[in-house]
Amino acid sequence: MKRTALFALMMTLLLTGCAPERDKNEFLRWQKELAGGTGARFSAAVAADCGGETVLYAGEVVCSGGETSVTLTAPETVAGISWRSADGGETLSFESVTLELAPGKTAEVSPCRAGPLFFAALREGQYLYGGRDGETRTAVLALGEFTVTAVFDAEMSPLRGEIRKDEKTLLTVEIDHWESW
């Protein structure tokens, strides 16, 4: 009887002790596939901290090759504005007219960079730790000066994320219509 109880206890410890490593390996395998692809497209709803005020944006993000573009879809006052990053340069435009890069309120990280920064962390970020909660998985990643927490569904499609710097949440991102190739 004691052997059976000891065996059951040992198996429980072995199985639960392997879960964090299994989660890490599954994420790293997914990250390698994403890094081996050429890009992704997704919709992002972003909440940005702009000097103590939370500002909400929505946009379509396309990351392909060395180019990233974000077209804002909400709020209505900025819908249609596009941000593009390629070859180390950035442009902000509306109907082919280049706009000033930092008009009005500024955030520590531009809301236009939320989607691309989130994608870069998924693709290149250093895995710190992660876990599971029911059908969702979480990975916490380091990318330069940022810490990015990403939440995935059971099929490893990103659902949401949080971008932090120095323990302060700068941006939160809700992901929809994820597609990678």
What are these regions (language model features)?
Residues 42, 71, 149:
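Hydrophobic-ligand binding "helix-grip"
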Residues 127-181:
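Gly/Pro-enriched, hydrophobic low-complexity segments
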